[in-house]
């Protein structure tokens, strides 16, 4: 284990030197229930890693509402038929499973479906309350072949994933009460593709394109956000160090950096190839201090600056105990002060 003065050192370069996505762009074609999102640039392979993980969580782990039990007036069990109703009870139950709902509470809610007139009975006949709203009002529940009273009492709950009828807590099968298999997930479909992304002259980075379709109870961007939070919380247990230690080490290194005499060197003093030197000059980088404050991403975006030049410069910085992405407060001011001292000494 790497230590300094008996203290453990955290090598933050393992994650700070990776290219990070700049923004999650939402496509203009997105709607309240469909979202197309583009995330770039990502290190090669990270598109598949993140896309697959997000897809699994989106489909399996988000909370949603579903009907878990139904009591149809005059019906004893799900294999019954109802006079004056074209569909049998089994068909009605299958139709109820298609109803999508939005709930504003974690407490179970009771709803009622009422109809009297001949014709189609759709989910819009379900009487919601201030805690529950019906999203899929066009779903056909049953068809009345004559005028008659038709009533279904429903129980709605929040949950996640798929729960079989016999697994609902606190509900037991009894005469007249029909338990339903419930699919709680508010996310209906997730697809992702990986394309090439460009960083400077390099094209071997990933672009993650994520398409999410929901039932309307949650916005696609919120679904992604919640899923990312779930993944973040689950991965925390694998981090075996306090990130404050990492910050402390970063501060110690910053103190070392500010004492480093190489900071004020001109890039002309470095043993770099002509191509690398010219690239730095074209980016208006004159000193080592200016150079090391650039991130890998910023460097690779520089015109005509490729991976080979980047690796060459990175090795030179390492030889001086420096690296990309470091920060020095008021570097320009310190550089000017150093120049004045140098001119005074030379005079």
UniProtKB/Swiss-Prot annotation:
Cited Pfam families: RNA_pol_A_bac, RNA_pol_A_CTD, RNA_pol_L
Disulfide bonds: none
Region: Alpha N-terminal domain (alpha-NTD), residue numbers: 1-242
Any one Gene Ontology BP term: DNA-templated transcription
Matches recorded under Gene3D superfamilies: 5' to 3' exonuclease, C-terminal subdomain, DNA-directed RNA polymerase, insert domain, RNA polymerase, RBP11-like subunit
InterPro entries per UniProt: DNA-dir_RNA_pol_insert, DNA-dir_RNA_pol_RpoA/D/Rpb3, DNA-dir_RpoA, RBP11-like, RNAP_asu_C, RNApol_insert_sf
Region (Alpha C-terminal domain (alpha-CTD)): 259-347
Matching SMART domains: RPOLD (SM00662)
GO cellular component: cytoplasm; DNA-directed RNA polymerase complex
GO molecular-function terms, A-Z: DNA binding; DNA-directed RNA polymerase activity; protein dimerization activity
Catalytic activities: RNA(n) + a ribonucleoside 5'-triphosphate = RNA(n+1) + diphosphate
Enzyme class label: transferase
Protein's UniProt keywords contain Nucleotidyltransferase: yes
Keyword terms of this UniProt record: DNA-directed RNA polymerase, Nucleotidyltransferase, Transcription, Transferase
EC assignment: 2.7.7.6
Matching CDD domains: RNAP_alpha_NTD
Keyword DNA damage: no
Protein role: DNA-dependent RNA polymerase catalyzes the transcription of DNA into RNA using the four ribonucleoside triphosphates as substrates.
Domain remarks: The N-terminal domain is essential for RNAP assembly and basal transcription, whereas the C-terminal domain is involved in interaction with transcriptional regulators and with upstream promoter elements.
Protein family per UniProt: Belongs to the RNA polymerase alpha chain family.
Assembly information from the UniProt record: Homodimer. The RNAP catalytic core consists of 2 alpha, 1 beta, 1 beta' and 1 omega subunit. When a sigma factor is associated with the core the holoenzyme is formed, which can initiate transcription.
Protein name stated in the entry: DNA-directed RNA polymerase subunit alpha
Organism: Solidesulfovibrio magneticus (strain ATCC 700980 / DSM 13731 / RS-1) (Desulfovibrio magneticus)
């Amino acid at each position: 284990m790497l230590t300094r003065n008996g203290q453990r050192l955290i090598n933050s370069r393992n994650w700070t030197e990776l290219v990070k996505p700049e923004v999650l762009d939402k496509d203009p074609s997105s709607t309240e229930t469909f979202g197309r999102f583009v995330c770039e640039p990502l290190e090669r392979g990270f598109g598949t890693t993140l896309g697959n993980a997000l897809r699994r969580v989106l489909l399996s782990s988000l909370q949603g509402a579903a009907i878990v039990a139904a009591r149809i007036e005059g019906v004893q069990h799900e294999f019954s038929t109802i006079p004056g109703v074209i569909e049998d009870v089994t068909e009605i139950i299958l139709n109820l499973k298609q109803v999508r709902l939005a709930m504003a509470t974690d407490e179970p809610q009771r709803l009622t479906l009422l109809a009297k007139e001949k014709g189609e009975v759709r989910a819009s006949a379900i009487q919601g309350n201030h805690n529950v709203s019906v999203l899929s009002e066009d779903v056909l529940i049953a068809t009345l072949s004559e005028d008659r009273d038709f009533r279904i009492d429903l129980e709605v709950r929040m949950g996640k994933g798929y729960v079989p009828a016999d697994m609902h807590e606190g509900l037991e099968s009894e005469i007249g009460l029909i338990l339903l298999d419930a699919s709680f997930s508010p996310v209906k479909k997730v697809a992702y593709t990986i394309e090439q992304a460009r960083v400077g002259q390099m094209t071997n980075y990933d672009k993650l394109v994520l398409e999410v379709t929901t039932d309307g109870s949650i916005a696609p961007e919120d679904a992604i956000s919640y899923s990312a939070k779930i993944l973040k919380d689950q991965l925390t247990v694998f981090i075996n160090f306090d990130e404050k230690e990492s910050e402390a080490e970063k501060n110690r290194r910053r103190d070392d950096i500010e004492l480093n005499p190489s900071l004020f060197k001109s890039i002309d003093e470095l043993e770099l190839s002509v191509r690398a030197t010219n690239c730095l000059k074209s980016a208006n980088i004159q000193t080592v201090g200016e150079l090391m404050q650039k991130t890998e991403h910023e460097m690779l975006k520089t015109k005509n600056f490729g991976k080979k030049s980047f690796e060459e410069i990175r090795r030179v910085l390492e030889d001086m105990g420096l690296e990309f992405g470091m920060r020095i407060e008021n570097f320009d001011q310190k550089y000017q002060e150093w120049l004045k001292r140098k001119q005074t000494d030379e005079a």
